[in-house]
Amino acid sequence: MADFLAATRDAPAHPSLLRALNCWPAEPANALDLGCGAGRDSLHLLARGWHVTALDRDAQALSTLALLCPDDARARLQLLQRSFEDADPLPAAHLINASFALPFCSPGRFADFWRGISNALTAEGLFVGHFFGERDAWAGQRLLTFHDRTALLQLFDSWETLHFEEHEWDGKTAVGQRKHWHLFEVIARRS
């Protein structure tokens, strides 16, 4: 985890979060950053005036985010050290960000965790996140969750889907390991 945190601590916010923020019609409100890591997305949200609850199972990730948080934003940052499997109930939020995070929820607990996400998101709230597809190099690892296109679209049946893209490419992980990626990027508004 230390290598991942070092590799991502100065990275800019994910483009998917920036796209989602362009869909937000109101003043900044409460955001929940799931699997926040070193805080690249949390820090961007704080800089834009949001109140952020950053959740990660790793204490070092949360410590890194706390160190990087500007003094004038500390009162708007809450840190929660929990795994996805132990995160119920989630705090209410107007925006839930899950950049490259949800695949790390165990498959047997994903449905409950997704229900928790749906319940935590306010009406008209935005979800933005990534899901690994079944052709991802890590597919088959029993502790990770993967989706096919049909199953993923069913998760958002009653939502307004604002952005849905499927990507597949050969690249590297944040720590430089070669990997075949199969990824879905979703931005949706809760009805």
Model-predicted segments: where are they?
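ABC ATPase nucleotide-binding domain "signature" loop
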Residues: 104
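Class I (Rossmann-like) S-adenosyl-L-methionine-dependent methyltransferase catalytic domain
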Residues: 1-28, 32, 37-88, 108-112, ...
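A conserved beta-strand element that flanks and buttresses the S-adenosyl-L-methionine
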Residues: 97
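Short catalytic micro-motifs in class I SAM-dependent methyltransferases
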Residues: 100-101
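A short glycine-rich, Lys/Arg-flanked "PGG" loop and its adjoining helix->strand segment in the class I
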Residues: 111-123
